[in-house]
From Swiss-Prot:
Alphabetical list of PANTHER family matching this protein: NADH-UBIQUINONE OXIDOREDUCTASE CHAIN 3 (PTHR11058:SF9)
Keywords: Electron transport, Membrane, Mitochondrion, Mitochondrion inner membrane, NAD, Respiratory chain, Translocase, Transmembrane, Transmembrane helix, Transport, Ubiquinone
Protein name, UniProt field: NADH-ubiquinone oxidoreductase chain 3
Catalysed reactions listed for this entry: a ubiquinone + NADH + 5 H(+)(in) = a ubiquinol + NAD(+) + 4 H(+)(out)
Pfam families xrefs: Oxidored_q4
Organism: Lemur catta (Ring-tailed lemur)
A GO CC term attached to the entry: NADH dehydrogenase complex
Length: 115
């Protein structure tokens, strides 16, 4: 007796919540929500706008540092090797390259947003 009542109640409640979730967003129409927006650029504008070289350099810098971090991720598993001194030397070299690259970008004002 309780099983049919529980099933009916849960199905009714589910259908009610799905109906409310379907109809409620249609009552509030936001113009910003339906306007196209691509990475801070207006996609409906001209395709020949000059591209900011600053965005490109920051993206390349991010990719390089991300690649170096990806090379450092397996180091905890590499610490189980027999040649621990070589693993620590390679890790130190990778971290030194990462720090030198960061210092170079900082000194060249590559991380500055305001010109």
């Amino acid at each position: 007796m309780n099983l049919p009542l529980a099933l009916t109640t849960s199905i009714t409640l589910t259908l009610l919540l799905v109906t409310i979730a379907f109809w409620l967003p249609q009552l509030n129409v936001y113009t910003e929500k339906y306007s196209p927006y691509e990475c801070g650029f207006d996609p409906m504008g001209s395709a020949r706008l000059p591209f900011s070289m600053k965005f490109f350099l920051v993206a390349i810098t991010f990719l390089l540092f991300d690649l170096e971090i990806a090379l450092l991720l397996p180091l905890p598993w590499a610490s189980q090797t027999n040649n621990l001194k070589l693993m620590l030397t390679v890790a130190l070299v990778l971290i030194t390259i990462l720090a030198a690259g960061l210092a170079y970008e900082w000194l060249q004002k590559g991380l500055e947003w305001v010109e």
